[in-house]
Amino acid sequence: RLIYNSYVADMAKYAGKGDSVKIAEAYDSLPVQLARENNKFQYKLIRTGARSSLYGASIDWLIQSGIVLKCTKCEQGLMPLAAYEDLSSFKLYFSDTGLFNSRLQLTKQSLAAARQYMGALTENYVAIQLKANGYKLNYWTSTATAEVDFVIVQSGEVVPIECKANIHVKSKSLDSFVKRYDIKQSIRLSMRNFGFENNIKSVPLYAAFCV
């Protein structure tokens, strides 16, 4: 809570009173944004009538200050990945998973019962680890319902990453991406141990920093 309060104080100090209100509103919407099955950032979830022209600068401030991490949608799993980015579609993650947990007001005891948030918390944790390793954050969705949590570039190759909060790891979305773009190797982060099967590298969540 103290860290959150210091962030809010910094918003007022460096962004000015008027802008800091919108910045705080955008930041406070993150738990709602991430808890949704479709967790693409939606301005309307900040408040009724909110739109990019009103809050775009506030989002940029949060990103530039390092308070949030931006993950941009890529429309194709092809190189160069940056050429296929849809800059209007993105997700925002907390730069600190502890802050996300604090904003959800979850305790160690209640965390196990809040299963609807486990996927979001897992994604947020992985986003932080990938960013710390210097990767640009992207994700992919098909025109249907398929979605790959993260898409990165390793040694000039597109590598999709799937995050699972448990040991159940089957993913039609990952399979669809691999077949569509002839991907040589994928990464799956889950509660399972290290392994390699069907060109999928299995990495336990605790070792996400190894990616």
Which ranges hold each PLM region?
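Structural motif
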Residues: E157-V159, Q185
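C-terminal helix of von Willebrand factor
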Residues: L205-V211
